[in-house]
Regions:
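Glycine-rich, acidic/polar active-site loops that bind/position phosphate-bearing ligands
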Residues: 2-237, 242-250, 255-499
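C-terminal amphipathic alpha-helical interaction region
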Residues: 434-639
Length: 639
């Protein structure tokens, strides 16, 4: 899993030549355990150059090998000749080792000694399906996976009639085929349903250990693309392929558990287990509070920026939602003494009032869909990651932050014990201090509201909206200290990763700008001019027929008005495309990758929306039969 965010593969055969010029099949375990690909052809942030290109792959035995298309696939880590990490898998594995070590040390305070603690994740994969013929007729979809222009359909999702609706038969056939392929590869998919937007769907798996779940999600996205074409679909994993309807995310349901099957985010039946539950919940909240800017940077991208903050996705401000019950427990704990009972209620019953339906067991928290990091009963749901990403980036940041915070908790408890405090008193005092300190990150209200944005700034939370500047969080002293002390990433590796992130951001915006410029000048403007000529011919024929008759002015008023409006939009599009090209040239002259990314964000990206506004207006004016691209009503409602 190189830093492209995708998977990469290399196929080797077991054929070996012999002295008599024949060949034999020779199986070598060494070839499976270690490989030697070119490391300079992948993004490396300067760690590898063409003249020093050697890299190594090493078998990851924690993730299952699988057979696809008659080949044995082996998940591997990828490092440079000098040992620097060049992939997303290796630091994720290191973060799991860090959380295992830190969590077991904290559990020892409670007299629990598991052999292993692991982080689990269940990534809910959202996606759109588009008919392949329509997809092929949209160069913007083919090249960027999002529509760079297109007016909203008169009907989209306003009736709320798609979510959990009946799955269209053609889509259902695709889903069945996809699930069969997933089971063949060991991907434990479990739930499928319609999502909110037209032609939007979701596939959710059973929870697995973080590294394995991430591998399976990467494999799932690859299989989805392959299987969709069998059914004359194209799957869109972009976070915001269509304006005016919901985007797609990858909600990562994250938890921690022991090898004994104990979920560390589930309350127990006695005082000690409940104190353990509060300890891990509070330390997670504390980690999110301290590293909220880093967690936002871990999910930031040019594509996810279109989704975050819209009224269907979490805001671009990291906060935690705990629900009424857990919030009350922490508030009570903060103001209690060590002698007070620690109680966490079990699920409550809800009787619906008629006998045919059984009593429902309610979770101990409600759901706040506007929160990017919500406690949902026995896990935290990280809703900010985008649908197209390798979720390893978000998970390694979260794992590392929580591991480092657990290390700090252990040190703080031991410091109080060294002062003569008992272990339980020390745990109480540290947790109470953490609850008080981390209060700014807790928010149970509407994350979409403008009031929350103002309040978040007052609380000192990171409110940065520029993606290139969000990446600076990786190189803050506290982030470097956290990653290096947990052994997840070195400062050099962090700097290289940021170089890659800035470069990817630049190229994403650059490609979109070039595609939109091409569509504007070669597709839209010629059609608009042609329709303008039709209107002018109509005006000329009216003039020829009615001459100076006063009726001519009345009858030609609307065509003349349309000609003026179309001419205005044509001039505006041409002017803004030229300005965008100049802004791109100016940005390209910058040599520093960070400064170039900032220039693309500030000076190039705004033109994408400005040009689109004019083209979308033209779409409503130009003859439908002349318009060169499939419209939203076709893309979203032809199934």
């Amino acid at each position: 899993q190189p830093m492209t965010g995708l998977t990469a593969e290399k196929h080797d055969s077991f054929i070996q030549p012999t002295d008599d010029r024949t060949v034999i099949m020779e199986f070598s375990g060494k070839e499976l355990v270690m490989g030697e690909p070119d490391a300079s052809s992948f993004p490396s942030g300067g760690l590898r150059a063409t003249f020093e290109a050697r890299g190594y792959t090493a078998w990851d035995p924690t993730s299952f090998a699988f057979i696809k298309d008659h080949s044995l696939y082996i998940p591997t880590s990828f490092v440079s000749y000098t040992g620097e990490v060049l992939d997303k898998k290796t630091p994720l594995l290191r973060s799991e080792a860090a959380i295992d070590k830190a969590a077991r040390r904290v559990l020892a305070l409670f007299g629990k000694f598991p052999k292993r603690v692991v982080s689990y994740v269940g990534p809910e994969q959202e996606y759109f399906l588009v008919d392949e013929d329509l997809y092929s007729a949209r160069p913007d979809l083919s090249l960027t996976e999002r529509t760079l222009l297109g007016h909203e359909s008169a009907k989209n999702q306003q009736l709320d009639d798609h979510y959990f609706g009946a799955i269209p038969s053609r889509v259902q056939e695709f889903m069945k085929d996809l699930e069969t392929e997933c089971y063949k590869l060991g991907i434990p998919v479990k739930t499928r349903h319609n999502e909110v937007a037209p032609n939007q769907f979701e596939l959710a798996p059973i929870y697995e250990e973080c590294n394995l779940a991430n591998d399976h999600n990467q494999l799932l996205m690859s299989v989805m693309k392959r299987v969709s074409r069998r059914h004359n679909f194209r799957v869109l994993l972009h976070e915001k392929p269509f304006n005016g309807v919901n985007g797609s995310g990858k909600h990562c349901n994250w938890s921690m558990g022991t090898d004994k099957g104990v979920n560390l985010f589930s309350p127990g039946k006695d005082r000690e287990d409940n104190l353990r539950f509060i300890t891990f919940v509070v330390n997670t909240i504390m980690a999110v509070y301290k590293y909220n800017a880093l967690l936002k940077a871990s999910i930031a991208s040019a594509t996810n920026a279109h989704r975050l903050g819209a009224n269907e996705a979490p805001p671009a401000i990291i906060s935690t939602f705990l629900g009424t019950q857990i919030s009350e427990i922490l508030d009570k704990f903060e103001n209690s003494s060590i002698e007070d009972a620690i109680e966490v209620d079990d699920k409550k019953g809800l009787h619906l009032g008629f006998g045919q339906i059984p009593e429902l067991l309610l979770d101990n928290t409600d759901r706040n869909r506007t929160s990017p990091f919500a406690f949902t009963g026995n896990r935290f749901e990280f809703r900010a990651p985008g649908s197209s990403v390798n979720c390893g980036s978000a998970m390694l940041a979260l794992n590392s932050a929580v591991a480092y915070q657990l290390q700090q908790f252990k040190k703080d408890v031991e410091a109080l014990q060294a002062e003569g405090k008992s272990k339980e008193v020390a745990i109480f005092k540290v947790l109470k201090a953490y609850i008080k300190e981390s209060k700014p990150i807790r928010f149970d209200g509407n994350g979409y509201s403008d009031e929350w944005k103002e309040e978040a700034a007052k609380r000192g939370l990171d409110c940065q909206n520029s993606v290139p500047l969000q990446y600076d969080a990786y190189l803050k002293p506290e982030s470097i200290e956290m990653f290096t002390s947990t052994g997840v990433l070195t400062q050099k590796e962090l700097e290289a990763r940021n170089e890659v992130k800035w470069e990817v951001y630049i190229k994403k915006v650059q490609i979109e700008a070039r595609v939109l410029g091409d569509l504007s000048l070669n597709h839209i403007i010629p059609v608009a001019v042609r329709y303008q000529s039709v209107l002018l011919d109509n005006i000329a024929k009216l003039k020829e027929t009615f001459g100076d008759d006063p009726e001519f002015c009345d009858m030609s008023e609307e065509p003349r008005r349309l000609v003026r409006k179309i001419a205005g939009h044509i001039c505006a599009v041409t002017k803004k495309v030229d300005e965008m090209v100049e802004a791109r040239k100016k940005a390209n002259r910058l040599t520093d990758m960070r400064e170039k990314a900032i220039a693309y964000h500030d000076s190039v990206a705004p033109y994408l929306d400005e040009i689109r506004d004019h083209i979308d207006d033209l779409e409503l004016m130009v003859d439908n039969q002349m318009w060169p691209l499939p419209k939203y009503r076709e893309l979203l409602f032809i199934r």
